[in-house]
């Protein structure tokens, strides 16, 4: 989801996007932190572990170092997996928000609301359908 284009959108869409952004902000913060930790930690550890395995001897001190690098690599990969889980939570939260927003609409008919809800459930990136819904709702609101 690209929140950078929000500033170019009409006010009624901008308001809804800001509400979505506010709902997913805690998940986005966690995702950024986990990825920020995961990538350097895993890359550093895996690189050192690979270099260590090719150039080190098999004494006790070397095995402890290898174990530490393996543990750090596993930690980095776990952070990366958690970042992926947080990203899925973001998508789920956005979908739930959009579906609830469509259900709450008092301007569109039940048929149109169910059509938009179906489109959002079927599309992997449903933002376009949600923007169409908001545009149609605003257009009908101005008519009445």
Swiss-Prot record:
What compartments host this protein?
Answer: Cell membrane
Instruction: Name the source organism.
Output: Bacillus subtilis (strain 168)
Q: Which Pfam families match?
A: DUF5392
Instruction: Kindly provide the name given to this protein in its UniProt entry.
Output: Uncharacterized protein YwnF
Residue spans crossing the bilayer: 31-53, 63-80
- Membrane topology field: Multi-pass membrane protein
- Presence of keyword Transmembrane helix: yes
Taken from the UniProt entry, a GO cellular component term is: plasma membrane
Question: What InterPro entries does UniProt report for this protein, alphabetically?
Answer: Uncharacterised_YwnF_TM (IPR020205)
């Amino acid at each position: 989801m690209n929140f950078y284009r929000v500033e170019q959108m009409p006010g009624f869409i901008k308001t809804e996007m800001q509400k979505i952004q506010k709902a997913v902000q805690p998940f986005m913060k966690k995702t950024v932190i986990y990825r920020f930790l995961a990538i350097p930690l895993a890359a550093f550890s895996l690189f050192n572990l690979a270099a260590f395995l090719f150039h080190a001897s098999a004494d006790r001190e070397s095995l402890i170092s290898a174990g530490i690098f393996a543990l750090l690599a596993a930690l980095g990969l776990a952070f990366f997996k958690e970042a992926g889980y947080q990203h899925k939570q973001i998508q789920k939260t956005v979908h739930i928000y959009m579906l609830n927003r469509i259900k709450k609409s008092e301007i569109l008919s039940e048929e149109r609301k169910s059509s938009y809800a179906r489109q959002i459930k079927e599309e992997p990136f449903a933002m376009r359908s949600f923007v169409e819904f908001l545009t149609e709702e605003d257009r009908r609101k101005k008519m009445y």
